[in-house]
């Protein structure tokens, strides 16, 4: 019975002395882990920022392309009277004198090219 107590006490002392880590070591390990976590967070943050900047650049390009390729907002259609000095005929149309000239016609109309 004595040997059991001594053995138990010996195992207990060894477990406490070897199993318990130093407080400074724990603090250092925690600091290293938080620094690594911060570096990972900074890396992820920079990566996300780059992706957002790329998306923003693409969106701005699409907006500028839409404004360049947008259709004419106000133009005169085919067979509509136009002014010879300031023709506002739609693309593909030209401001010309009509072939049949009567008194009810104005001087120029928009016709296909």
From Swiss-Prot:
One of its GO terms (molecular function) is sodium channel inhibitor activity. Residues 60-69 have a biased composition (Basic and acidic residues). Disulfide bonds join 75-90, 82-95, 89-110. Residues 60-83 are annotated as: Disordered. Keywords: Disulfide bond, Ion channel impairing toxin, Knottin, Secreted, Signal, Toxin. The keyword Disulfide bond applies. InterPro entries: Toxin_22. One of its GO terms (cellular component) is extracellular region. The presence of a 'disulfide through disulfide knot' structurally defines this protein as a knottin. This is U11-theraphotoxin-Hhn1j.
